[in-house]
Amino acid sequence: MKIYLVGGAVRDSLLNLPVKDKDWVVVGGTEKILLERNFQQVGKDFPVFLHPETHEEYALARKERKSGKGYTGFDTDCNSDVTLEEDLIRRDLTINAIAQDEYGNYIDPFQGKKDIECGLIRHVSESFIEDPLRVLRVARFAATLVHLGFKIAEETMLLMCIIVKKQELSYLTSNRIWNETEKALKTLNPHVYFQVLYECNALHFFFPEMYFLYEKKNFLNRSFFKKFCNKNIILMGLAEISLLNKDIDVRFSYLCQFLSVNQIDRNYSKIFFDSYAASIIHSLCKRFKIPSYIRDIAVLNTGFYFFLNTIHYQSSKNIINLFSKVDAWRKPDRVKKLAFLSNFNFLRNFKSEFFCIKSGCFLEKCFSVVKNVSIKLILKKGFKGYEIKQEITRLRIKKLEFWRIKNIKHRFYL
């Protein structure tokens, strides 16, 4: 029985990247042998075991044969006579099909090291097309490695297009799609992920809302599209915001704020909270079961997008209503998230010399002015029930209005 380090740990080591998880393949072993050595079996579809001390994953070498549709339609052979090369050939990319033995020697039957040197993301074999999940994985690896000069091999992109054409993507679960998307959003260049999906014709299947951004003819409001929603501007913005902020909810929210404009042709200046735009994002998040902490910021930022961009002109009453709508009194961190996004949009979309304070900074300043209005004084005055809410809202509006009037001479806003 021989044990080899495989997959991402070998790849990242060769790339001088931090190694996060170590996966091992066991050649010539059996379930019985590993269980006798106190390994814990955890795999459902095929035998995977946790090391009794390190808790790293050890999988029996296996062969796979396509027997059905989608990424789960495989028959697996984990017999002890399966060779290392037979195990490696079933992997998606050459850079992920390198093994390392206990002495540090590399076993690289598919020239993965050469592809790493050349910066090439290339499939291992023609069986690549049997697993539709690989479309998302390749797009994600492109986003992960583009800063190191990697690109997708032309023949691999061709196979990705074939997978899409065969309609294999329909067998992917929403959970699988989001898992890969979430990983991509955490990379240095998440915009590359969506661009690759567009180039292999998969974007319209996974994210039809985003696909519309590539189809200008679908936009009703042409002038708005040209100014704010050109696909290159949006993807460039996603690239830029990712340099400034690592939070996935912020990155995702930036992207989402544009996804409803293809259906809208209205007077934005009169909108407090755009329920229609927010509902599109809410439906998207529901479709992929996106975590609530990401969904909530995305929905709020989209709904208040135009309000926040014109916050200098908004009434104190509406600003207080915004804080209540986003539940800022209990979740002040939401104000920081929305302020960051608003500042970013402000600096990209408007001439900042018009104002002495950015829209997001103004939002945070307003919140700092009113967040400590005391409810104790209201209770002492005998207010009860709904009257308490009305009175604290009135006091917050009054305090904010006083601050704004007092500071007009300092030109905090027009």
UniProtKB/Swiss-Prot annotation:
Cofactors named for this entry: Mg(2+)
Binding-site list for Mg(2+): D21, D23
Entry-linked SUPFAM superfamilies: Nucleotidyltransferase, Poly A polymerase C-terminal region-like
Residues passing through the membrane, by range: none
Coiled-coil stretches noted in the UniProt entry, renumbered to this chain: none
Cysteines engaged in disulfide bonds, as pairs: none
EC number: 2.7.7.72
Alphabetical UniProt keywords: ATP-binding, Magnesium, Metal-binding, Nucleotide-binding, Nucleotidyltransferase, RNA repair, RNA-binding, Transferase, tRNA processing
Reactions mediated catalytically: a tRNA precursor + 2 CTP + ATP = a tRNA with a 3' CCA end + 3 diphosphate; a tRNA with a 3' CCA end + 2 CTP + ATP = a tRNA with a 3' CCACCA end + 3 diphosphate
Gene Ontology MF term list: ATP binding; CCA tRNA nucleotidyltransferase activity; magnesium ion binding; tRNA binding
Residues the entry annotates as binding CTP: G8, R11, R91, R137, R140
Annotated family: Belongs to the tRNA nucleotidyltransferase/poly(A) polymerase family. Bacterial CCA-adding enzyme type 2 subfamily.
Misc. comment: A single active site specifically recognizes both ATP and CTP and is responsible for their addition.
HAMAP family in UniProt: CCA_bact_type2
Entry protein name: CCA-adding enzyme
Organism: Buchnera aphidicola subsp. Acyrthosiphon pisum (strain Tuc7)
